[in-house]
Amino acid sequence: MSEQLPTVSDLLVSSAASLVNLAGIRLTEQEHKDPAAAKEAIEAARALLPLCPEEAVAPIKEALSQVQMLYVKETDERAKARSKIWTPGSP
C-alpha cells in the first residue's frame, strides 16, 4: 500500500490556514499573546494567498480578515494603555 503525498496546493492551503490559526492564538490566548508574532503570521499567510488554489482563497481570506481585525483591536488597545501611563511632567 503506497501512501499518497500531498500536493503543493494542499500544503500551501494547510500552511496558510496554520498561519492564520497561529496569529489568532497569538492574539487571544493570554499565555501565548505576542502581537508581533501574530503580525508576522498574518503577513506570511497573506503572502501565500496568491499561490493557493482559487477555491481555497475565500475561506482563508475570511479568517485572515477576522484575525487582522483582532490585531488592529489588540494593538490599538495597547497604544491607548501606553498613552494613559503617567510620565514626569504630565498632568
What is the role of each PLM region?
Residues 43-55:
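Short, charge-rich amphipathic interface segments used for partner binding and complex assembly
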Residues 1-44, 58-66, 70-91:
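N-terminal intrinsically disordered, cationic/polar leader segments
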